[in-house]
Amino acid sequence: MILANAFCIVLFVDETLRSLAAPPSPPGQDLQGWRVPVDCIRANKLCAAEGSCSSRYRTLRQCLAGRDRNTMLANKECQAALEVLQESPLYDCRCKRGMRKEIQCLQVYWSIHLGLAEGEEFYEASPYEPITSRLSDIFRLASIFSGMDPATNSKSNHCLDAAKACNLNDNCKRLRSGYISTCSKEISATEHCSRRKCHKALRQFFDNVPSEYTYRLLFCSCKDQACAEPRRQTIVPFCSYEDKEKPNCLDLRNVCRADHLCRSRLADFHANCQASFQSLTSCPGDNYQACLGSYTGLIGFDMTPNYVDASTTSITISPWCSCKGSGNLEEECEKFLRDFTENPCLRNAIQAFGNGTDVNLSPKNPSPPITMLPKVEKSPALPDDINDSNTMYDTSIITTCTSIQEHGQKLNKSKEQSLCYSETQLTTDTMPDQKTFVDQKAAGSRHRAARILPAVPIVLLKLLL
């Protein structure tokens, strides 16, 4: 009898341990990547192929189509549709700037996220995939294409050099000549240009010409007005930027947000250029490139920004608007405007590009970094089938990492960079802008299984005795 009971207990414990130690099933409803971020065009197709998602998505679109959107969204059926769709691929989908069917992709994105927002938010999440490239990549390509670095020869007119470099590239020359011609074409005695056509031509230029050329035209470093004024004139501001009167900034924001494309570019600008005083550069993720890319993405829309003057001592950027007539919303308006005019992230990013510098960063929350050559005699033994690749280090990188630790993080003004990563960071966080979804429950289950295993023989021994 005792042996029979012991046998039953063994079977029970074995089954329990199997269930605890087994890997978790993928999140979501099936294995089609429901919780894996995909572009919104693909997400829309996945949703259409699943009956429940498809019907709820149609319901939500009807809820958002009415004039009184907030009242409709308060409806129980609309709320139920939103809850279901938050578990669908539509919730995590993103778009890519300049992608084919970009407008269609953004329409899908906002059809979900406008329903989730409670009224108008001051800052909205960006619908675009995060930018992972750095300014150093732009510098390298610029030197390859033009034969010189963006900031070489301090006595030269960098903006003139940028125009020359553009003229040497057929695509850049063609699209630049196209928008200058369109924006300078007089329509009538009362209408000196077509702003709509001018904006469209500008968007074609900045969306289709590589940043190696467009950045040099927009952000060239200037020491005199002979350079700074052509830089200000890059976007033909008398047509694309200036107007007879300055509208209220909040009114201009409302006009922009009425268009999915303009709304997306504005949200992306705030996401990548919003001043962060907890970072070295004042930029989110210390990424100058992401901020400058978002800035250029706004050109060619109602919210087009530009230099307010040809000053060489300070950089001031602003859309063509003011806060006059804001009434009770003056504080909100001033805050919105300061994100352009007094933005340390944007200013630092422009200056960094003009100077040909980028920031060299170590991880924000690193494991103990590698700062000295490993001592072989103290290294733990590894299995025979595993190569000890960590024992081979570049001494120049180690010296750089040590220097950063001793003297604090500084802007890297050299052409070549060496990033300081810990062993854990090198294997698990090589792309900091992308998130990895980890099931915390699964990890806990494996730990519990490890704790239970040693106790099994003791239980069996007591039963047998």
From Swiss-Prot:
Interacts with NRTN ligand and RET: forms a 2:2:2 ternary complex composed of NRTN ligand, GFRA2 and RET receptor. InterPro entries: GDNF/GAS1, GDNF_alpha, GDNF_rcpt, GDNF_rcpt_a2, Glial_neurotroph_fac_rcpt_a1/2. SMART domains: GDNF. A lipid is attached at S445 (GPI-anchor amidated serine). GO terms for molecular function: glial cell-derived neurotrophic factor receptor activity. One of its GO terms (cellular component) is receptor complex. Pfam families: GDNF (PF02351). It is found in: Cell membrane. This is GDNF family receptor alpha-2. The keyword Glycosyltransferase does not apply. One of its GO terms (biological process) is nervous system development. The keyword Cell inner membrane does not apply. Residues 446-465 form a propeptide. Belongs to the GDNFR family. Receptor for neurturin (NRTN), a growth factor that supports the survival of sympathetic neurons. NRTN-binding leads to autophosphorylation and activation of the RET receptor. Glycans are attached at N355, N387, N412. Disulfide bonds join C40-C93, C47-C53, C63-C78, C95-C105, C159-C220, C166-C172, C183-C198, C193-C239, C222-C227, C249-C321, C256-C262, C273-C291, C283-C345, C323-C333.
